[in-house]
Amino acid sequence: MARTHLLFLLFVLLSLATSSTSTKEQEEDRIKALPGQPKVGFSQFSGYVTVNESHGRSLFYWLTESSSHSPHTKPLLLWLNGGPGCSSIAYGASEEIGPFRISKTGCNLYLNNFSWNTEANLLFLESPVGVGFSYTNTSSDFEESGDERTAQENLIFLISWMSRFPQYRYRDFYIVGESYAGHYVPQLAQKIHEYNNAYKNPVINLKGFMVGNPEMDKNNDRLGTITYWWSHAMISDASYNRILKNCDFTADRFSKECDSAIYVAAADFGDIDQYSIYTPKCVPPQDQTNQTKFEQMMQMHTTKRFLEDQYDPCTENYAEIYYNRPEVQRAMHANHTAIPYKWTACSDSVFNNWNWRDSDNSMLPIYKELIAAGLRIWVYSGDTDSVIPVTATRYSLGKLNLRVKTRWYPWYSGNQVGGRTEVYEGLTFVTVRGAGHEVPFFQPQSALILLRSFLAGNELSRSY
């Protein structure tokens, strides 16, 4: 095991030594302007970084530098989405924290008033290979995807990328992600921590990480999810009790009786967006043909009410139109190998791949290690997500047995309660009121306030 780790570090070192540090390579990745983009004052870069030469594995990135007057003083923030198999460009960049939003036609971009690039230089990475524009020349690689290889190749990417962008070496660096990135983020942070301990003067100045609605611990995630369904009146008492009777949440695999109980309970939900249980789900025009006039009218009324608050449940569809446009791909230096499939928000080759090689049951041992290492760690949870709900996260965090520094209190976003928070020794937990699975998408102002407090290392405001 030690020899394997040493060989990996030597490979990373070789990658660093052979990567070009020339301005030319960086300039080749510069985006002059994206199709339909409003005029902006910040720089953008995108392109590929090879993470495995022999197999032809390359990861695609998009850097949007800070819009502040002094981007060179702002930290670098890497954003990762989960799945596994979902694109950080589709979700993180285009729906959540990036500087642009995509119009309904997929033709134009408009500014996100709550973009996180006011506070940091944002690096979006499509990982692992097979996600978005990231690719491999070896088809069998899809059968070898897993947590360990993803973490290793994300580290290789970062070191090689920093040789292309040397101005970000030693810059304060943070990793943020959501959902299954609850695995990716702490696992990458652990790899960086190990790498930094192995070398003098390491180039990645990791300060901390933050995860939202994260997968943390399989047993507690399962129990917390069922509890949320029942406590939020999504399932009946009978369904809840049937699940408790037939399901062993500590088992590696559920029994047939448990699967059946969960299947029956899911029918209690109705046709809702499970990632945001109180907002309307996306209903594309072609799906409205079987609706009555009254149903169509009510759908339009409900959607209009939420759109006035800048919420649109169909934004994922607009991204798939925009990023498949040839002129957009040319502007982003993407798909230069003519990948034989369309760009999608979530990749079938990864998302539907039952051959995902390894997925740790619990991230809690990594949390304990990195808390002891002194990293800044925040965990936040949108309280209307039923897929990885706040109850699951609270159960998981409870297993860490951390000492409470600042007891539970409401924090404010403007003149409204933004959520609640509790501060522990080595970790801060935050709920975001009225937010679903993608917190910055549903509550952009609150999410930006959350980011500012995280980067500053300050507790969230108790008053407005």
From Swiss-Prot:
Q: Where in the cell is it found?
A: Secreted
Residues at the active site: S179, D385, H437
**InterPro entries from the UniProt entry:** AB_hydrolase_fold, Peptidase_S10, Ser_caboxypep_his_AS, Ser_caboxypep_ser_AS
Where does the UniProt annotation place the signal sequence?
A: 1-22
What superkingdom does the record give?
Answer: Eukaryota
- What EC number is given for this enzyme? 3.4.16.-
- Which Cys-Cys disulfides exist here? C86-C346, C247-C258, C282-C314
Residues with attached carbohydrate:
N52, N113, N137, N290, N335
Give the Gene Ontology MF terms in alphabetical order. serine-type carboxypeptidase activity
| Stated family | Belongs to the peptidase S10 family.
Biological function: Probable carboxypeptidase.
What's the protein called, per UniProt? Serine carboxypeptidase-like 22
